[in-house]
Amino acid sequence: MEQPGQDPTSDDVMDSFLEKFQSQPYRGGFHEDQWEKEFEKVPLFMSRAPSEIDPRENPDLACLQSIIFDEERSPEEQAKTYKDEGNDYFKEKDYKKAVISYTEGLKKKCADPDLNAVLYTNRAAAQYYLGNFRSALNDVTAARKLKPCHLKAIIRGALCHLELKHFAEAVNWCDEGLQIDAKEKKLLEMRAKADKLKRIEQRDVRKANLKEKKERNQNEALLQAIKARNIRLSEAACEDEDSASEGLGELFLDGLSTENPHGARLSLDGQGRLSWPVLFLYPEYAQSDFISAFHEDSRFIDHLMVMFGETPSWDLEQKYCPDNLEVYFEDEDRAELYRVPAKSTLLQVLQHQRYFVKALTPAFLVCVGSSPFCKNFLRGRKVYQIR
């Protein structure tokens, strides 16, 4: 205690205080073996703030936070604090936390439209870098309602429209921004890019429409050719001609049905004659052959001669010769078989009243007539000879 009348600034008093201070052990200092960890807990020297602040672990930081986010402060002050916090997270490229901070600022519902517009625009920027382009677009739209001439919001909105492939909208946003600043470089570059992409998109739409119209006309011509020949299609077996045409159209627009993996399709030549993709099945060996364009006026024997001009690798007994082969088609509804004369044309068979073309790909069974397999295969089935 100071002596009465003694000057507290005198050298004697100061020396006495220092001697007393030095005689007492220092408490609260850093431990030598973990000073870096303890140093990191001091708010001023933290390299990065913790995601969750525990008052027991970081009492100083918790105290600062309570001061910064004091609920007794005005909504404007709190919103600005959250905006600044979000900006710090944004600079660190921690966009998720930036979104959270800007959202908290907006929740304060402050009366300053400019501040709210900035919060929306900044949150849009964070959402943009997170790849949430639609959310970002919603935010810049909200910002423009508060501040229609907010150039940053317009630029960000144009970027979002580009990412969402809304090229016409991107051009419109750029035009609106250029009315505010006709020399804004970002808007000029973006508008040129968006306009180019818009024209490409419009060209592609026109090409797609022309292609669709051409295919629709081709399908209609094919349907009329099929109807004129009295050929029955299992997919379009309906009374309504428009529905039948639509059924054909769907098949062509889908490429081909799953039963035809080769990409071939029914076609009509310049003379008005049809060529069909045709499948030959050899049940004895679980093998098959696919003919991509079997002209309707061609005979079965003509194709068999080509396919079996050389013995196939799977015909170990070398019995699959054109003269030995029998061709059948199956009536699935009646579980009946019809033997096809080898010299008949494809059109003659397809016009048979019990033949229904499935998946636009006629299919036929082929086996060696004199073989035990064929006899066993036909046993118990009704077999009819086409004349």
Swiss-Prot record:
The modification Phosphoserine is found at S47, S51, S243. Pfam families: Wheel. One of its GO terms (cellular component) is cytoplasm. It is found in: Nucleus; Nucleus, Nucleoplasm; Cytoplasm. Changing V42D: No effect on interaction with HSPA8, HSP90AB1 and CDC6. Highly expressed in proliferating tissue and tumor cell lines but not in normal cell lines. Keywords: Acetylation, Antiviral defense, Cytoplasm, Immunity, Innate immunity, Nucleus, Phosphoprotein, Repeat, TPR repeat. This is Tetratricopeptide repeat protein 4. It comes from Homo sapiens.
